[in-house]
Protein backbone atom coordinates (compact mmCIF):
# COMPACT_ATOMS: atom_id res chain seq x y z
CA UNK A 1 0.00 0.00 0.00
CA UNK A 2 2.73 2.45 0.99
CA UNK A 3 4.86 1.51 -2.01
CA UNK A 4 2.03 2.09 -4.46
CA UNK A 5 1.28 5.45 -2.84
CA UNK A 6 4.91 6.54 -3.14
CA UNK A 7 4.96 5.37 -6.75
CA UNK A 8 1.82 7.37 -7.54
CA UNK A 9 3.29 10.53 -5.97
CA UNK A 10 6.57 10.05 -7.86
CA UNK A 11 4.70 9.52 -11.12
CA UNK A 12 2.67 12.72 -10.62
CA UNK A 13 5.87 14.69 -9.99
CA UNK A 14 7.39 13.17 -13.14
CA UNK A 15 4.35 14.21 -15.19
CA UNK A 16 4.45 17.73 -13.76
CA UNK A 17 8.15 18.19 -14.57
CA UNK A 18 7.67 16.76 -18.06
CA UNK A 19 4.73 19.08 -18.67
CA UNK A 20 6.77 22.13 -17.61
CA UNK A 21 9.47 21.20 -20.12
CA UNK A 22 6.89 20.76 -22.89
CA UNK A 23 5.34 24.15 -22.10
CA UNK A 24 8.77 25.82 -22.30
CA UNK A 25 9.48 24.29 -25.70
CA UNK A 26 6.02 25.30 -26.95
CA UNK A 27 6.42 28.91 -25.82
CA UNK A 28 9.78 29.19 -27.54
CA UNK A 29 8.62 27.78 -30.87
CA UNK A 30 5.27 29.57 -30.76
CA UNK A 31 6.92 32.99 -30.46
CA UNK A 32 9.25 32.18 -33.36
CA UNK A 33 12.45 32.44 -31.36
CA UNK A 34 15.56 30.43 -32.07
CA UNK A 35 18.33 29.94 -29.56
CA UNK A 36 21.68 31.59 -30.14
CA UNK A 37 24.20 28.83 -30.78
CA UNK A 38 26.57 30.02 -28.05
CA UNK A 39 23.88 30.66 -25.46
CA UNK A 40 23.49 27.82 -22.97
CA UNK A 41 20.66 29.46 -21.01
CA UNK A 42 18.39 30.06 -23.98
CA UNK A 43 19.52 26.83 -25.61
CA UNK A 44 18.24 24.87 -22.62
CA UNK A 45 15.07 26.93 -22.56
CA UNK A 46 14.27 26.28 -26.22
CA UNK A 47 14.96 22.59 -25.87
CA UNK A 48 12.76 22.45 -22.78
CA UNK A 49 15.45 21.10 -20.46
CA UNK A 50 14.94 23.65 -17.71
CA UNK A 51 11.86 25.55 -16.51
CA UNK A 52 13.50 28.96 -16.94
CA UNK A 53 11.90 32.20 -18.10
CA UNK A 54 12.31 34.80 -20.83
CA UNK A 55 13.20 37.35 -18.14
CA UNK A 56 16.37 35.44 -17.28
CA UNK A 57 17.45 34.78 -20.87
CA UNK A 58 16.53 38.22 -22.18
CA UNK A 59 19.03 40.02 -19.94
CA UNK A 60 22.53 40.49 -21.30
CA UNK A 61 24.57 38.53 -22.14
CA UNK A 62 21.55 36.32 -22.88
CA UNK A 63 19.76 37.26 -26.07
CA UNK A 64 17.26 35.69 -28.44
CA UNK A 65 17.66 35.59 -32.17
CA UNK A 66 14.38 35.76 -34.07
CA UNK A 67 13.98 34.30 -37.56
Curated annotation (Swiss-Prot):
Signal peptide start-end: 1-25
Protein's job: This endoparasitoid wasp peptide has immununosuppressive, antimicrobial and insecticidal activities. Suppress cellular immunity which is detectable as a reduction of hemocyte encapsulation in the host. Shows moderate antifungal activity against C.albicans (MIC=4 ug/ml). In vivo, ingestion of this peptide (probably at excessive doses) increases larval mortality and reduces leaf consumption of D.saccharalis, a permissive host for C.flavipes.
Cell membrane listed as a keyword: no
Note in the entry: Negative results: does not influence host total hemocyte count. Does not influence hemocyte spread index in the host. Has no effect on humoral immune system, since it does not influence the activities of prophenoloxidase and phenoloxidase in the hemolymph of larval Diatraea saccharalis. Non-toxic to human cells, Gram-positive or -negative bacteria. In vivo, ingestion of this peptide does not impact larval mortality of the lepidopteran species S.frugiperda, a non- permissive host for C.flavipes.
GO biological process, one term: defense response to fungus
Tissue spec. comment: Abundantly expressed by teratocytes, which are extra-embryonic cells released by parasitoid wasps into their hosts during larval eclosion.
Domain comment, as recorded: The presence of a 'disulfide through disulfide knot' structurally defines this protein as a knottin.
Organism in which the protein naturally occurs: Cotesia flavipes
Transmembrane segments: none
Disulfide topology: 28-42, 35-46, 41-57
Alphabetically ordered keywords of this record: Antimicrobial, Disulfide bond, Fungicide, Secreted, Signal
One annotated Gene Ontology cellular component of this protein: extracellular region
Name this protein carries in UniProt: Teratocyte protein CftICK-II
Subcellular location as annotated: Secreted
Amino acid sequence: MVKSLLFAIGYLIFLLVTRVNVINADICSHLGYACADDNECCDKFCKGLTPTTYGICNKKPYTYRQY
